[in-house]
């Protein structure tokens, strides 16, 4: 399975600084920022969860188990990297004291009362990232060039596609095309990079033997096992997929949408089309205090293009790219032609997003083409560089670093 972010174009031509990230979890620190309005009403307890080497969902489940509640009773606003030190808010609407929970590499601190947290209830994240063994002398030129071009390309990072097994976008496309058996073969059968269960996956890909897979797939592959059991009951891979929780099904479709967005952005760079200047036919997103308001969009025409470009210069608007779906706002003119080309080359049509089973249907939307990190600063320590910046939700720090490091 090819790297879904490997061939994407860089915006800057300056050489990268190289180096390594995430050598140690402490090299990648993430602190979540949520709206203050969360604390204005509500009776749920809000805690800061500090974790290291834990996936968010695994940490939530372990905490829930320790206090005797179902994990769905603990709310959270966003998922965070595993190989990192992360601080995020969680909520629980029960009279329990999470500060008493003792789990290795997890700390919990009560910070007040508020409304229950849900996915998406965050403004963004502060990052402190150490890049080791780099060439810091090359940094000023790449930073200056990125500033001149309006920021960094807002690619979806590898996390969106599966870091150790980058198959989510492939599964998403096959589901969209109604090829459920092929989608199942990829999801169940493609091995990862030295992961437990890889050999069982390989055998399934070769033999398609469901009974053998059920004997050999480890118990922790619970979604895969649930699908295999459902297929055995029904003989339908479509029904087997629908046994999965809605958030998991949506990950597949979101991943394919993200893949297409990345292709659009890369193609726009390749064709020399601007990212920080609107063209007639573009859709722009309103920006308030540095935060893109992705649901507030307006179309660029010959009549308003100068006004829109003034707004972009003033930091009040950003050019957007497509998150394809059955209700997304289409570009026109040159940007619209590019959108049509990307869809055509992928072999999908917009109506496919509506023909999906209900839990997978996606209306689509728009996403800004550039990342403009706020409070951006860096410090050089010998061959290491320590970066600090804030990014709005849904934006990947690794995409900023990709442009700076170019490795």
Swiss-Prot record:
It comes from Pyrococcus furiosus (strain ATCC 43587 / DSM 3638 / JCM 8422 / Vc1). PANTHER family: PSEUDOURIDYLATE SYNTHASE PUS7L, TRNA PSEUDOURIDINE SYNTHASE D. Belongs to the pseudouridine synthase TruD family. The gene is truD. It catalyses: uridine(13) in tRNA = pseudouridine(13) in tRNA. It is an enzyme of class 5 (isomerase). Gene3D superfamilies: 1.10.1510.30, 3.30.70.3160, TruD, catalytic domain. The keyword Oxidoreductase does not apply. This is Probable tRNA pseudouridine synthase D.
């Amino acid at each position: 399975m090819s790297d879904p972010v490997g061939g994407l174009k860089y915006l800057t031509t300056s050489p990268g600084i190289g180096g390594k990230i995430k050598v140690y979890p402490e090299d990648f620190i993430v602190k979540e920022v949520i709206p203050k309005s969360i604390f204005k009403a509500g009776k749920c307890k809000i805690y800061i969860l500090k974790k290291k080497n834990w996936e968010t969902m695994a940490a939530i489940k372990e905490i829930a188990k320790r206090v005797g509640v179902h994990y769905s009773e603990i709310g959270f606003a966003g998922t965070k990297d595993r190989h990192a030190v992360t601080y995020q808010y969680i909520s629980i609407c029960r009279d329990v004291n999470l500060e008493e929970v003792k789990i290795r590499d997890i700390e919990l601190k009560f910070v007040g009362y508020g409304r229950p947290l849900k996915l998406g209830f965050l403004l963004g994240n502060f990052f402190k990232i150490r890049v080791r063994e780099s060439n810091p002398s090359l940094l000023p030129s790449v930073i200056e060039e990125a500033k001149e071009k309006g920021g960094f390309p807002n690619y979806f990072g590898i996390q969106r596609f599966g870091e150790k097994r980058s198959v989510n976008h492939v599964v998403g496309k096959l589901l969209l095309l109604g090829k459920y058996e092929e989608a199942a073969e990829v999801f169940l059968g493609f091995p990862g990079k030295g992961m437990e269960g890889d050999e069982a996956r390989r055998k399934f890909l070769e033999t398609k033997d469901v009974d053998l897979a059920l004997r050999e797939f480890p118990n922790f592959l619970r979604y895969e096992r649930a699908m295999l059991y459902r297929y055995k009951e029904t003989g339908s891979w479509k029904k087997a997929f629908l046994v999965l929780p809605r958030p998991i099904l949506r990950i597949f479709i979101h991943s394919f949408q993200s893949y297409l967005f990345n292709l659009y952005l890369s193609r726009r760079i390749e064709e020399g089309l601007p990212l920080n200047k609107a063209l007639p036919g573009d859709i722009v997103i309103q920006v308030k205090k540095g935060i893109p308001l992705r649901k507030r969009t307006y179309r660029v025409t010959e009549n308003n293009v100068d006004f829109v470009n003034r707004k972009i210069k003033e930091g009040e608007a950003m050019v957007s790219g497509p998150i394809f779906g059955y209700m997304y706002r289409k570009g026109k003119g040159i940007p619209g032609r590019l959108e049509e080309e990307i869809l055509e080359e992928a072999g999908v049509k917009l109506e496919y997003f509506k023909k999906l089973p209900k839990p997978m249907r996606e209306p689509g939307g728009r996403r800004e083409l550039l990342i403009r990190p706020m409070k951006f600063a860096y410090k050089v320590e010998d061959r290491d560089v320590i970066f600090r910046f804030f990014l709005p939700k849904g934006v990947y720090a690794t995409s900023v670093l990709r442009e700076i490091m170019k490795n």
